[in-house]
Amino acid sequence: MMNGKIDIKNLTLDDLIAFLAGKGKERYRARQIFKWLYQKDARSFAEMTDLAKDLRRDLEETAVISDLEPEAMEVSRDGTRKYLFRLEDGNTVESVLIPEEDRTTLCISSQVGCAMACEFCLTGTFRLTRNLTAGEIVNQICAVRRDVPVRNIVFMGMGEPLANLDNVVKALKIILHDDGLQFSTRRVTVSTSGLVPEMERLGREVTVNLAVSLNATTDEVRDRIMPVNRRYPLRLLLDACRSYPLPGRRKITIEYVMIKGLNDSLEDAKRLVKLLSDISSKINLIPFNEHDGCSFKSPDQGAIDVFHSYLLSKHFTVITRSSRGSDISAACGQLKGKLDKNVSGI
């Protein structure tokens, strides 16, 4: 609620149908409003000219259309863009747009801060402040699309998406709906550090791609760098990956942050092959992006090449991700801090 009014951007189409039914309005009105919000980017009810004036007046009295505008934006040497959004309560989140030859990918946030405390991640050094609403999640996409076209959406920004599953699922239903933002399920990926029960629920409620931040091949190492592993160790996590419902020939993305001397050896590569032998997956190797919040180091190029080559020799689909946006602290594991501090003059 905002000033006693409902934020209409927090409503799925079914929610909006129910909201309007309480006003005695027809179901098709909800579809009209949805299209105005997400396909015509309406930011006021007055713009919705195919709605009766009395309905527009009623909506203005009982509802608001929330919005986000970037407070700041930085552009990396490689074209990556980082957007800072200030929320209604003064908190901030960041989104990152990654341009590639044939597409653009928008990395969006789902929480202010993060409670997962992954040792290699700068965002994890900021305590969780709160969950984002569905509207705050969706509005990141709406705002960036006013600047540049967006083809892919990844929930890999600030926060653990599955720790805010109610609002993330609502946002996904808006993102995927034909009357909403109209993204194909193939173009939307949700990343998790490994919240097993929530992985199962996500698979039941929506059809999206799944990325799992694995980063270790033994429980001993994963316990150290990802506290979530103490609750859901590798055995449970990999079982959840095996049972996650993906249509057709799609694969789960396994994200593997390579850290020098910790998880970058040939033996790690061999264990990874065994762990994933019966899971339909593709592997993203992510050389660790060094930052002031952590003493870990990036792996040597030779170690990366050996690791990559071994996975290829075992017929895995594998990509070694280049570091995008590291000069503006927009690379994997670097979100939150620098841009906000620059704006605030700290």
UniProtKB/Swiss-Prot annotation:
S-adenosyl-L-methionine binds at G159, E160, S191, S213, L214, N215, N289. GO terms for molecular function: 4 iron, 4 sulfur cluster binding; metal ion binding; rRNA (adenine(2503)-C2-)-methyltransferase activity; rRNA binding; tRNA (adenine(37)-C2)-methyltransferase activity; tRNA binding. It catalyses: adenosine(2503) in 23S rRNA + 2 reduced [2Fe-2S]-[ferredoxin] + 2 S-adenosyl-L-methionine = 2-methyladenosine(2503) in 23S rRNA + 5'-deoxyadenosine + L-methionine + 2 oxidized [2Fe-2S]-[ferredoxin] + S-adenosyl-L-homocysteine; adenosine(37) in tRNA + 2 reduced [2Fe-2S]-[ferredoxin] + 2 S-adenosyl-L-methionine = 2-methyladenosine(37) in tRNA + 5'-deoxyadenosine + L-methionine + 2 oxidized [2Fe-2S]-[ferredoxin] + S-adenosyl-L-homocysteine. Its main location: cytoplasm. GO terms for biological process: rRNA base methylation; tRNA methylation. Its cofactor is [4Fe-4S] cluster. InterPro entries: Aldolase_TIM, Methyltransferase_A, RlmN_N, RNA_MTrfase_RlmN, rRNA_lsu_MTrfase_RlmN/Cfr, rSAM. This is Dual-specificity RNA methyltransferase RlmN. It comes from Geobacter metallireducens (strain ATCC 53774 / DSM 7210 / GS-15).
